[in-house]
């Protein structure tokens, strides 16, 4: 028995030692300071880079030049990687930006009463045949059959599915209206010529909202409500936008507007009135007139990227699927509908397109994957003595400013010069880059702080850095 107890004590001691050793390994691997949280470091980020143009073209499956700034920059810094024509892998930085954009969208949609749902991407052919869009959509619709021969499509939009869903609720009351249902999911479209990276792909993320109202007047009020939410969204992102009258296209309805970001590579042609701010897609305007229909002033032409689209549908879909509600008098009436889309990945790429320089990505501040990058001195340099000071700064920032936890990266690639790491940070567009250069050895230490969105460079003490970062807003 005594021998057994001795062996148990030995095993316990070995286990404790092993556990301590593993903790040391983890701490070293993740750059953890004793008693501190895990530090996020650049060296551990999965970020394929430096693809040659011929590699990119081979991955995309077509021989054409990279003709779009956002596409070129996102490929160069490893934000996206082509999987097949029109389909991209989104790398960790990009996923973080998309998630932040979705949070902003959620805030705006839920502020007006939106309820988030999730509908299947596979949509039965009979729903689309009921509206005639199985044939109307033509080759853009990605179609498939299951093992039983049943036909489906990968939904580019969900008017049929959501109307059938609401119609299945036989006791829908006027008291539940307006009903605003939305989702953020992957959509699919068999683009004949996918190009411009995330701006025109075959698979993309989209926010689509569908509204159900008790009357035409109420539906148009809801239409205005959602449009106003879109305006606030783009204002929060710091983007210059236009709300342009547009064609209803294959979705149908009686009224439609596009939200456009003016930019030269845009594929949509728009006319704008400088006097009354009327704007419209040229698809619905007689260009030979060149006169504003609202104020009779002259129209100018520009190009834009469509990032949002709204439709007043009336009873186009509710009449087909019998989506009724019961009014205050017990009568069964057709719901008046609207649908509203936001291209999530397209907004991200379009924002990079309009905000970035030719060489460096610039994000809407709310969407930057990480808000701060801290660059310690190069190993073996004269400033290397400041390494501990800058690591302590990282810990102090993330502990004292809770909103920045998970938002600060430490560029631990100390085999590289500060200049090389600053160049990488500029390309990736962190809103703030903090460098431990020569003045970090002063008493008190001063850090070189780059504000990427303003171009300002200042030297601040730790207290100054903390005060500056206190004002950073994170979603």
UniProtKB/Swiss-Prot annotation:
Entry-linked Pfam families: HGTP_anticodon, tRNA-synt_2b
GO MF annotations in UniProt: ATP binding; proline-tRNA ligase activity
E.C. no: 6.1.1.15
Reaction catalysed by this enzyme: tRNA(Pro) + L-proline + ATP = L-prolyl-tRNA(Pro) + AMP + diphosphate
Main location class: mitochondrion
Highest taxon, organism lineage: Eukaryota
Gene Ontology process terms (BP): prolyl-tRNA aminoacylation
Enzyme kind, highest EC tier: ligase
Record key words, sorted: Aminoacyl-tRNA synthetase, ATP-binding, Ligase, Mitochondrion, Nucleotide-binding, Protein biosynthesis, Transit peptide
Record localization: Mitochondrion matrix
Presequence extent in this chain: 1-29
GO CC terms, sorted: mitochondrial matrix; mitochondrion
Family to which this protein belongs: Belongs to the class-II aminoacyl-tRNA synthetase family.
Biological function: Mitochondrial aminoacyl-tRNA synthetase that catalyzes the specific attachment of the proline amino acid (aa) to the homologous transfer RNA (tRNA), further participating in protein synthesis. The reaction occurs in a two steps: proline is first activated by ATP to form Pro-AMP and then transferred to the acceptor end of tRNA(Pro).
Protein name: Probable proline--tRNA ligase, mitochondrial
Source organism (scientific name): Rattus norvegicus
């Amino acid at each position: 028995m005594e021998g057994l107890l001795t062996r148990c004590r030995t095993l316990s001691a070995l286990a404790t030692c092993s556990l301590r050793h593993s903790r040391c390994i983890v701490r070293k691997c993740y750059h953890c300071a004793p008693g501190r949280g895990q530090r996020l470091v650049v060296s551990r980020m999965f970020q394929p880079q430096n693809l040659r143009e011929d590699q990119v073209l081979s991955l995309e499956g077509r021989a054409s030049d990279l003709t779009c700034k956002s596409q070129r920059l996102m490929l160069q810094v490893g934000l996206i990687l082509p999987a097949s024509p029109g389909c991209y892998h989104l790398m960790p930085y990009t996923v973080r930006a998309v998630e932040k954009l979705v949070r902003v969208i959620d805030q705006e949609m839920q502020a007006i009463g939106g309820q988030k749902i999730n509908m299947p991407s596979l949509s039965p052919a009979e729903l689309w045949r009921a509206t005639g869009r199985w044939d109307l959509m033509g080759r853009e619709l990605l179609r498939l059959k299951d093992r039983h021969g049943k036909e489906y499509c990968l939904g580019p939009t969900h008017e049929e599915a959501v109307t059938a869903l609401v119609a299945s609720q036989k006791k829908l009351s006027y008291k539940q209206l307006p009903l605003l249902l939305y989702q953020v999911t992957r959509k699919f479209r068999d683009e004949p010529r996918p190009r411009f990276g995330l701006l025109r792909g075959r698979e993309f993320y989209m926010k689509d909202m569908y509204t159900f109202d008790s009357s035409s007047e109420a539906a148009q009020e809801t239409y205005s409500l959602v449009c106003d939410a879109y305006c606030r969204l783009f204002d929060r992102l710091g983007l210059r936008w236009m709300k342009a009258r547009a064609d209803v296209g294959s979705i149908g309805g009686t009224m439609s507007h596009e939200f456009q970001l003016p930019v030269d590579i845009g594929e949509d042609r728009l006319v704008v009135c400088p006097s009354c701010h009327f704007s419209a897609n040229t698809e619905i305007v007689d260009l030979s007139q060149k006169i504003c229909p609202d104020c009779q002033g002259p129209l100018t032409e520009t190009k834009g990227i469509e990032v949002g689209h709204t439709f007043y549908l009336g009873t186009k879909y509710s009449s087909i699927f019998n989506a009724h509600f019961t009014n205050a008098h017990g009568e069964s009436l057709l719901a008046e509908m609207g649908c509203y889309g936001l291209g999530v990945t397209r907004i991200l790429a379009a924002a990079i397109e309009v905000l970035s320089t030719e060489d460096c990505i610039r994000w809407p501040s709310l969407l930057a994957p990480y808000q701060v990058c801290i660059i310690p001195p190069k190993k073996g340099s004269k400033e290397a003595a400041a390494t501990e000071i800058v690591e302590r700064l990282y810990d102090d920032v993330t502990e004292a400013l809770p909103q920045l936890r998970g938002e600060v990266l430490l560029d631990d690639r100390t085999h590289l010069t500060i200049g090389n790491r600053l160049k990488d940070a500029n390309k990736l567009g962190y809103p703030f880059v903090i460098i431990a250069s020569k003045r970090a050895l002063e008493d008190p230490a001063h850090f070189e702080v780059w504000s990427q969105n303003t171009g300002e460079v200042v030297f601040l003490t730790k207290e100054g850095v903390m005060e500056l970062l206190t004002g950073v807003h994170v979603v």
